Amino acid sequence: MLDLAARVAMRGVGAVEPNPTVGCVIGREHAGGVEILAIGHHGRFGGLHAEAEALRVCSERGIDPAGATAWVTLEPCNHQGKQPPCARALIDARIKRVVYASPDPNPVAIGGAGALREAGVTVDESDESDAAIRSSAPFRYRIETGLPWVVAKWAQTIDGFVATSAGDSKWISNLFSRRSVHRLRAKVDAIVTGIGTVLADDPLMTARDVPLRRLARRVVVDPKGRLPLDCQLVRSVTGGAPLTVAVSPSVLERNADWYRTLLERGVDVVAFEPDAEGRFVIADLLRWLARERQVSTAMVESGPKLLGAMHEEGLLNQLLVFIAPTLLGDPAAQSSVGGSPIASIAGAARYRLDHMKRFGDDVRLLYRATD
């Protein structure tokens, strides 16, 4: 049942953040299995939570859920926010048993399991559904670390290159793969890139030709303040697509006219102090995005330098890799991720393959960082 709740929960991705995606199944347990009474998911920010939605469906169908079991991907909340406490709703509905996959780490909402037990409800935390645990991972990660969940995306050739030695990369992946990227852009809170990608490609970095649930914030890591004022990213701000440019503090004085012009055009320009070695600290930017702009999920679409820096800071939660049926065989071509040399394979980072999908002759691989 938790696997089903997880599938239902994913319907809310891109519509509920910064809240968690949550799914709920209410059913009656019998010797021969489970009779499903209702399912529900958190469908939009500010809307009914998954448990309340499932109970609403029961009411709409004239079903009394008393004595039933509720399977929920995340521990029911125990606070009054935009919606009343889910724990109280389950108690009032006389639910007999609640099974949840992950405890709620939010200090504002914790305590649901305890409240249910005090009311006589049997409560079990279950780790049997990896899908249910993963469904709320971005939310739990942000609450526990103060960082958004980061997905690094790139397209590469069979031999692992993202561009030729001359810098050409259009297009490695096919049309179907690129359309899937636009669908993903429509579901994340932010899209992060580096100034090198902007100068080379002048990208727009918006979701196009797909249903839009939100306009993702475009974020450019630009320590030296080189973003062209006439680039597509800046021009599109007036159309409602937000833009943040992350710079070093010295830029604000050295490029005062540039800074003022960007502010006048509605661009966020935020300065971050470098580390002791003068390097831009990407984690500081990500924490600011999570805290000040409520970014829960961010997708990185950049060149190897920024990806390598984020990898070395341990900031990549998932890798979304498109492999195209193209072989370059170019020793000077650009690899997907930069970084410092590693002497042995044993010292390399390991990721777990979560999902694989084919788009024509392209293959999309989704990897997750191991604990």
Language-model features: where?
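Flexible, gly/pro- and Lys/Arg-enriched active-site loops
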Residues: 312-351
